[in-house]
Structures are given as C-alpha cells and as structure tokens.
C-alpha cells in the first residue's frame, strides 16, 4: 500500500516569496506519494490521538485553497487558524505558510501547546525542529534509519524532517507500522487516574526501559 504525505511546497510562481495569498496553483500545499527526501529526523507524537488529529489538520489544510505558500508570510496561517478555532478547513481569509510553519500549526490544531517552540512568534524552521519541538514534551525524536529511508515503518501523523531543507506529514501507515498496544494504553490511563499523575509524569514513566511491565504492575497494584 502506498504511503502518502501532506506538505507545503512552493508558491504559484515556483518561488518562496511574493506570491498571492492562498493556494493559487493548487500545488502550493499538496498531497503526494512518499519520497526519499534525505530525511534526518522523524518526529512522532507520544499520544496516538494527537498524531491522528495532526494528520487530519494537515489534510484539512491541504484541501483549503485559502492557504498558500510564502516564506516571508509563513506565520499568517497561524493567526488565521487561531481565529478559526484551529479548524484549518474553516479558514476563509487567504493566508500563507511554509513547510515547517505548516507542521507547527498542525500540531497546535491537534491540541499541542507549541508556544515554547516559537521564537518571538516565529515558527521553528527545519533546522530548529529537533530542539524546539522536544521542548513541548509531547513528541519522540527518532533517528533510526528504518524510519528515514523507507515508508514501511511510518505511522499516520508522523513528521519527517530533512533538517537542512524540508518537512512533511505522513498521512497513512506503512505496511510494517507498529500497531498500537491497546492494553498498554489502557494501563497508562489507569495509572494516571489511580495515582493522580500528570500527563508529563506518565510520559516520563513510559520512557523507562521496561515501561510495559512497569505500567501493568502499577495499574494492577493491590
């Protein structure tokens, strides 16, 4: 099964600035088949529900012809997304983004507080994403080559990054994508409720080497 990605690519004139706001060509934001883009980093949401919401936001953004590409106006999408309650499909005012600013807005549309990732209101560029996205505590930073050189292990909602050039959103699972361990997710929820823990604490426990055994013991502790 082919894996598809969503991305902000280039303006209607084949450039990076001074185009007309909105998706004039129909390809400024677009859906494409996965390709080998020299990816150096995979950013994966720790919560599968967040990943799903990010992918849906990306699809809505690509489908909305009021959202175009312009590096000099890259943060205007964020302003309009806020006005639209983070529903990218509901944006009515022509605005602009670029590849990395688009990914950040998709994360915000999924409910992630990305304020810590921004610098004076400017979305992190590709070379800043590893450091800035990590500050939210909501994402894993993955550099295993199997995720970067093939689509097989990718999951819907993953963010692929070439840290010197480009970033895209994965829109469907690869053929060998790990399946969500529903029992483990249920144990995490039970531990959070039982011990009145914050999401951050549960996420920290989940990074422990034997996290699945630990969560099961805590969830079922007598």
Place the predicted regions along the sequence by residue.
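Loop/turn positions that initiate beta-strands
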Residues: 156-158
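N-terminal capping segments
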Residues: 1-117, 164-165, 177-213, 217
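Short, well-ordered loop/turn sites that connect or cap secondary structure elements
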Residues: 148, 152-154
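Short, basic/aromatic beta-hairpin or loop at an interaction surface
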Residues: 113-141
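Short beta-strand-centered aromatic/proline hotspots
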Residues: 166-174
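Positively charged
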Residues: 141-148
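Interfaces that engage single-stranded nucleic acids at replication/repair/recombination sites
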Residues: 220-222
């Amino acid at each position: 099964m082919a894996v598809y990605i969503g991305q902000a690519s280039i303006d209607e004139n084949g450039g990076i600035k001074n185009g007309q706001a909105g998706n004039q060509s129909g390809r400024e934001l677009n859906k494409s088949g996965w390709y080998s883009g020299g990816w150096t980093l995979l950013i994966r949401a720790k919560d599968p529900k967040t990943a799903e919401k990010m992918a849906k936001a990306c699809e809505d953004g690509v489908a909305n012809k009021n959202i175009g590409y312009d590096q000099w106006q890259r943060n205007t999408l964020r302003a309009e997304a806020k006005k639209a309650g983070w529903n990218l499909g509901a944006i009515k005012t022509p605005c602009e983004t670029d590849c990395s600013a688009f990914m950040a807005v998709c994360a915000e549309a999924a409910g992630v507080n990305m304020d810590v990732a921004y610098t004076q209101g400017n979305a992190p560029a590709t070379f800043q994403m590893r450091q800035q996205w990590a500050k939210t505590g909501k994402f894993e930073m993955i550099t295993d080559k199997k995720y970067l050189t093939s689509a097989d292990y990718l999951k819907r909602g993953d963010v692929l990054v070439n840290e010197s050039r480009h970033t895209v959103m994965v829109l469907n699972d690869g053929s060998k994508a790990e399946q969500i361990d529903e029992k483990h997710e249920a144990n995490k929820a039970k531990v959070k409720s039982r011990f009145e823990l914050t999401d951050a604490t549960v996420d920290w426990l989940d990074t422990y080497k034997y996290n699945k055994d630990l969560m099961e013991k805590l969830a079922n502790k007598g």
